[in-house]
Every structure is written in C-alpha cells, then in structure tokens.
C-alpha cells in the first residue's frame, strides 16, 4: 500500500514537472534559460507574460490564440529588435501599476548586473533606493481625463531618475553610491478605458502599465569618456560656480575659459531655461547624478547653442563627502540667432553697435576689467541695450509706410529695435545714435519749440535755451527724429497729464462736459497749429470754423487727441482771442497796425527766441454777423484780413513753452476769467457802451465740474474763475487803464439752449 502511494506521488510530481517544463517552453525566452528555471520562476515569468499580453495584445508576436507563422520578414524583425537593444545603451522595462516588473530586456544585466529572469515578475521597489519609493509611486499614479467618454486610450509622459541596485564589479559598474546606480528613465504611462455593460460611454479608466527606457549616466572621470568635437567638460562647485572649463568651450560658445570662471552656470543660461536647470541641480544634489533637459547656453557674440549636460557629484576620496560637480556637455546645434544679445556679458564682450551718446564717449569693450573698474568709470561709459536684436530688420522704411497717410511713423522711419549684423552695423558711419534705433536725421527733438528751416536742414543739433540736453537726448531715444520733408505727427502736446479729479471713464467724460471739436494741422516747420482748435457751440455739432476744418480733420494725427487736450487747447485759443479783443477795445481804430507789439503783455507765448508776432482775433459767436465791422478785422503782419481769409496761416504757440524750465512764469497776480459753456452769447443789439451785469445763471450746473479741475500749465484752479474780486482786480491790473470786463459777457435770452457760446479765459502775464 505504501509502495503504491509513493509511486503515485512520484508520478504526480513527474507529470507536474513535465507540465512546468512544457509551460517554460512556451515562454518567449531562449531554451538555455528556460531549461534551468525552477517552478517558482516559471510561475512568476508566466504570470508576467500573461499580464503583458493584456497590455500589448499583439505587441509580442502573433495574436493570442493564433498559430505562429514564420516568415523571413518576422526573422528580420526579431534580429533587428535585438540589435536595437544592443545599440540602445540602456534597457527597456514595463512595470505594472502595483510595481511588478512585467518585462525587462536582457541588456539590464550590462548596466545593473541583474539578470532578466531575476528581475521579471518581482517588484521594482526591491531594486530601487528606499528614498525613491515615493517618487516611483507618484510615477505610477494616473489621473482621469476631463472628457472621459471621448478618449478610449491615452498615454502620459514620464521622465524620472531612479537609484537602482547594481551588483557589478566596481571597475565595470561606473559610479555607484552605496551599491546603487542612477538610472535615467523616460517613457509613458498607458491608460485604457474599460466599458461597462450598463453604459458603454461611462467606463472606468485603469492604469495598465509604465513603459520606459533606462539609461545609465556617463561616469564622472573625464579620462573614462572620449570628448568629441561637439563636447566640452567643466568642473563646478556644489552651487554651480564654474571652477574649470575645457578649452573646447571657446570653439563652441565663443567664450574663453577665463571668461566663465568664477561665475555660476545660471549666469550664462537663457532665462527661460533656468527653472529646468534648477530642477536638475536639485536632483543632482539629492541623487548624485543627473541628465539635464535641453537648455540654451548663451554664446559670446550673441545668440545661443542648445546643450545637454550629464552631471555627476564627485566625492572626496578621504572623507567621502561631496567635493565638486563634473559635467560632460553635448553641444547639439550651431549658434542660433547670432547678434541677438540677451546678457550684459554678451554686449560688453562684443563692440556695441549703438550707444546713447555720441561715439566719442568711451564704451565698454573688455569684459575682464572687473566690477571695480566698471563702477569707477560708469559716468563716462554709456549703457547699451540689454535686449537686441535680430539682423533681419533693416533701417530702411517698410514698403507699406512709403504711401502711408501719416507720412511715415517713427517705428518704420527709424531702425527697428534689433541689432544688425557686424557687417551692417552703422557705428562707424554715424557719430550719434541710439541703443534701439538708428537715426538718419539728427535734427532738433525739442518738439515744444518752433523748428526753423535752418534747424531741419543743418546737421548740427541746436539746443534752445529752454531745452535741456539730457531731455533732448531722451526725446531722441523715445520718439525718434522728425524726418526732413516729412511731417511728423508726434509732439510734446500729446503727453499732457490728466488731473486726478478728471473722470476716469470715457462715458463719464462725455456726460460731464460738452463736445469740443478739435482740428489739427501741421506746419511745414514741424509742429502743431494751436490756432486751429475751435469750440463747438453744443454737443454733437461743429461751429462755423469747425465746419471749414472738418474735411481735413485728423489728416496728420495718428490718433484722436484726448478731451482734456482739446479743452486746454480751446481754452488757450479763447484766451488769445479775448486778449486781442481787449486790446482792440483799448486801442483806437486808427492804430490797429500796432496791435502786434501791444498785445504781447497778454500773450501766453513765453518764448525766449525770435518768433512771429501774435495775432489779434475776434471770438466767433453765434450772432457774429450782426456785430460791428471792426470786430471782424484781424491784424496779421501789417495786413487787414477777414477772419475767414487766412485761417490756414495761424502762428501757433507750443504748450511746452508754458512749462519749459527757462520760460517766463505766470505770476500769482495773473488772474483768469472763464465763462465755460454758460447760457450766454453775444447779443446782436448790444453796443460797446452797454455794461450788462452778469446773470446768476453763470453759476450753473457746470460749476461743480469746473471746480474739480485745475490747469496744470498755469497753476490756477477753476474754482476762482467766477470770483467777483478776481474780475475787479483784473481790470485794475491792466496798467491802470479802465475797462469793464462784463462788457464781453453778453447774456443769451433763451436759457434752454444749454452749452452754447464761447469759452473765454483772460490772463494778464507779468
């Protein structure tokens, strides 16, 4: 009985072993390996193989359940796959969501010393550093997509560094730390959707595995790796401060080794790549080795080269402490964007093409003079552009700009903010230029002052007395130079500041003040015509003068001026009109030819150079046709003209002269009288001898708005404009001559016509 049971057990074990051997033969492994496998290894490898067939149903040979068909193409494919693994300089592995290694290529033994059979089916956590377990868990964790029903299968990219166990001999293992070797793993996480029976569109997603390739990093010793022509090596401290560089860096980047020593690697890397470099630096300090992502290393003469670095921490042989960082760098491209300067070292290393001042000013040409010499001579050296500059842009105007209705813009008339190639740089041809723009015309940029014809045609730049040379140079830098023969559209009046009390929104502004139609025209001398500003009697309509100018409105201005600008210009126009009107009333009718000289005391033209005589004009009202004939006369350069005959020949006064440093100041005794948008007009039945009183309607709904605004150019607030004491003092301050100011305020009988009439401000300049 015992003999029978022993024989039965032996027979059962033999059958079991034969079944295991038959199962081992089915594994995609060489027969030399499968014949030596034990039962546990056969079960472990078989389960791993079955999991792999789920992940890749047709990726490992023929489809499941189909008979194998051998063909010459299949044999070639298998041989090619084995050769690819040999030339890969790494190994392929597939990890299940639970960390089990479903597949790993036999080339892993070359890098780790562990066989394929030993690793397959076992947990990867058994072969990686304990400090990397959390990172591996995070790599294997997937997140469900936002639109799950649209995606059947997707992949998530993964790139990470693992310290894997290495049992190779020390001379063949390369750099190991505590028996672990740093492996750079890159691949993807495969996610698949499994449909449910109840709802085929709302299936659950399952992580089916990680497919990755592992590369061992190069060794740290330079003698163990051959440096090719596109490679260079550097040694740095633990904070990436460069200590030593290979001489090949000069050929690849243009920098000499001594130019880079004592500076960190971050100093010479493109700003957009510093974050990736910082992450790699952190991994290097934690794990001892790292492969950086592709980053841009700045070249000496502008541009950059793409580089990838393999860095390793070298330990002290005596203390076993980290000593320094050794990096082998692969330069992958030639210099890109030559001439594009992104660092001050690049600019100082090469001759700057532009400077803020003339070429006689010394510039920084030597990068190795040190910080002390640069600080000591900072006053005499000009700073250059920290950004630059593509060589594809030229100084000529664009084709579309030649026929532009604006007559050329400063962005196309001047050079583009890009540097030219060294062969095209105009530094030797122009003695004065700018860091961002090259100017063909170096004439005056004092736009607030009149530009005579001689100032436009001469090469030298004239600084007027009220102009500061530094501000003029700043104007050339920001605005460009007005081109001779072309009408520039910029000027100092385009930058008038808004007061804090002014409405912030456009709607509030339009609702709080009447419409003012502003018309602009450019003289041949290169500045705006101030006298072309007219005031509209009511919102939405233009005055008599505004209709004449409507056809050429904004022909030269690139943008519509703001309403505060038009208000200031309209106010100045009416100041001039009222002053000349007072002078006409004061002077006898036979002495109208002398108004040009007598009107200067009331003029706002505080210029300190020769200028055309001011004009005497009559304020145009709605009932202008019924006034006396003498009120229609304008005196201009000794000629008696009608106000409609020479509207295009006004002599403007630039607003910048009012606030210029050397201009005459308006004394505190100067008083302003304004009647802005009141219910008043010039009565056709009013004579010069009548003296009507000011109606209380003058203090209408607009008083609250006017009280909030101050004219920054004169320093007076509008809240004092309607003071009776102010009006009385004004009449007493005009050289003792008596005349009644209220004679100019004609009340309109119809109070329903709101915002109709002209705005008048009277000032007495000392």
Swiss-Prot record:
Q: Which domain of life is it from?
A: Eukaryota
Q: Which organism is it from?
A: Pan troglodytes (Chimpanzee)
Q: Where is this motif: Nuclear localization signal?
A: 368-387
Basic and acidic residues bias spans: 394-404
* InterPro entries in the record: bHLH_dom, HLH_DNA-bd_sf, PAC, PAS, PAS-like_dom_sf, PAS_fold, PAS_fold_3, SIM_C
Q: Where is the composition biased (Low complexity)?
A: 373-385
Tell me where in or outside the cell this protein is found: Nucleus
- Which residue intervals define the domain bHLH in the entry? 1-53
Please list the residue ranges that the record marks as compositionally biased, kind Polar residues.
353-365, 649-662
Q: Which keywords describe this protein according to UniProt?
A: Developmental protein, Differentiation, DNA-binding, Neurogenesis, Nucleus, Repeat, Transcription, Transcription regulation
**GO MF terms held by the record:** DNA-binding transcription factor activity, RNA polymerase II-specific; protein heterodimerization activity; RNA polymerase II transcription regulatory region sequence-specific DNA binding
Full protein name: Single-minded homolog 1
Function summary: Transcriptional factor that may have pleiotropic effects during embryogenesis and in the adult.
- Segments forming domain PAS: 77-147, 218-288
């Amino acid at each position: 009985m015992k003999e029978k049971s022993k024989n039965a057990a032996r027979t059962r074990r033999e059958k079991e072993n034969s079944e295991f051997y038959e199962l081992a033969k089915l594994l995609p492994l060489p027969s030399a390996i499968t014949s030596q496998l034990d039962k546990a290894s056969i079960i472990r490898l078989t389960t791993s193989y079955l999991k792999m067939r789920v992940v890749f149903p047709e990726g490992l040979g023929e489809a499941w359940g189909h008979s194998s068909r051998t063909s010459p193409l299949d044999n070639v494919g298998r041989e090619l796959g084995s050769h690819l693994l040999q030339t890969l300089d790494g190994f392929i592995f597939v990890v299940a969501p639970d960390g089990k290694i479903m597949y790993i290529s036999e080339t892993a033994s070359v890098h780790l010393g562990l066989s394929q059979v030993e690793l397959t089916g076992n947990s990867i956590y058994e072969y990686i550093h304990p400090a990397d377990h959390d990172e591996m868990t995070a790599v294997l964790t997937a997140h469900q997509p936002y639109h799950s029903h649209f995606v059947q299968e997707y992949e998530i990219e993964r790139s990470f560094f693992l310290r894997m166990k290495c049992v190779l001999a020390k001379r063949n293992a390369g750099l190991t730390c505590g028996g672990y070797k740093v492996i750079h793993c890159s691949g993807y996480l495969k996610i698949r959707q499994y449909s449910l029976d109840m709802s085929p569109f709302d299936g659950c997603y399952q992580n089916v595995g990680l497919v990755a390739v592992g590369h061992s990093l190069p060794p740290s010793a330079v003698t163990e790796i051959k440096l090719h022509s596109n490679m260079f090596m550097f040694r740095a401290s633990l904070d990436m401060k460069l200590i030593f560089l290979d001489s090949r860096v000069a050929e690849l980047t243009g920098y000499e080794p001594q130019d880079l020593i004592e500076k960190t690697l971050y100093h010479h890397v493109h700003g957009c790549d510093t974050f990736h470099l910082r992450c790699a630096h952190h991994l290097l300090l934690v794990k001892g080795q790292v492969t950086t992502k592709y980053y841009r290393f700045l070249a000496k003469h502008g541009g950059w080269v793409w580089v990838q670095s393999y860095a390793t921490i070298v330990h002290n042989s005596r203390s076993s402490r980290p000593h320094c960082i050794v990096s082998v760098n692969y330069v992958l491209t030639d210099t890109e964007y030559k001439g594009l300067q992104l660092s001050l070292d690049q600019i100082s290393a090469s001759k700057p093409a532009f400077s803020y001042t003339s070429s006689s000013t010394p510039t920084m040409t030597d990068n190795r003079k040190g910080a002390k010499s640069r600080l000591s001579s900072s006053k005499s050296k000009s700073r250059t552009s920290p950004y630059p500059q593509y060589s594809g842009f030229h100084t000529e105007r664009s084709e579309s700009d030649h026929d532009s209705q604006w007559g050329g813009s400063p962005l196309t008339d001047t050079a583009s903010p890009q540097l030219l190639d060294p062969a095209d740089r105009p530094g030797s041809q122009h003695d004065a230029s700018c860091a961002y723009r090259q100017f063909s015309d170096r004439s005056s940029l004092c736009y607030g002052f009149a530009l005579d014809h001689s100032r436009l045609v001469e090469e030298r730049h004239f600084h007027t007395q009220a102009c500061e040379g530094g501000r003029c140079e700043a104007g050339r830098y920001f605005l460009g130079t007005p081109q001779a023969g072309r009408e520039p559209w910029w000027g100092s009046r385009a930058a008038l500041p808004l007061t804090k009390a002014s409405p912030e929104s456009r709607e509030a502004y339009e609702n709080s003040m009447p419409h003012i139609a502003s018309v602009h025209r450019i003289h041949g001398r290169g500045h705006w015509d101030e006298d072309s500003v007219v005031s509209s009697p009511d919102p939405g309509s233009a005055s008599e003068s505004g209709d004449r100018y409507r056809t050429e409105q904004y022909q030269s201005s690139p943008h519509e001026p703001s309403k505060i600008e038009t208000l200031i210009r309209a106010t100045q126009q009416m100041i001039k009109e009222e002053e000349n009107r007072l002078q006409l009333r004061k002077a006898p009718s036979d002495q109208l030819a002398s108004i040009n000289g007598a009107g200067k005391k009331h003029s706002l033209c505080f210029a300190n150079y020769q200028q055309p005589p001011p004009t005497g004009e009559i304020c145009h009202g709605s009932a202008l046709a019924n006034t006396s004939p003498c009120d229609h006369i304008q005196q201009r350069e000794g000629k008696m003209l009608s106000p409609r005959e020479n509207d295009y020949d006004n002599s403007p006064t630039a607003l910048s002269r009012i606030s210029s440093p050397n201009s005459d100041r308006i004394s505190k005794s100067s008083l302003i009288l304004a009647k802005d948008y009141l219910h008043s007009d010039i009565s056709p039945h009013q004579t010069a001898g009548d003296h009507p009183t000011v109606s209380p309607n003058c203090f209408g709904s607009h008083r609250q708005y006017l009280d909030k605004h101050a004219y920054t150019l004169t320093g007076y607030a509008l809240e004092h404009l309607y003071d009776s004491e102010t009006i009385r003092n004004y009449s007493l301050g005009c050289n003792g001559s008596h005349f009644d100011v209220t004679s100019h305020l004609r009340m309109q009988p119809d109070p329903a016509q709101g915002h109709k009439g002209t705005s008048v401000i009277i000032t007495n300049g000392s």
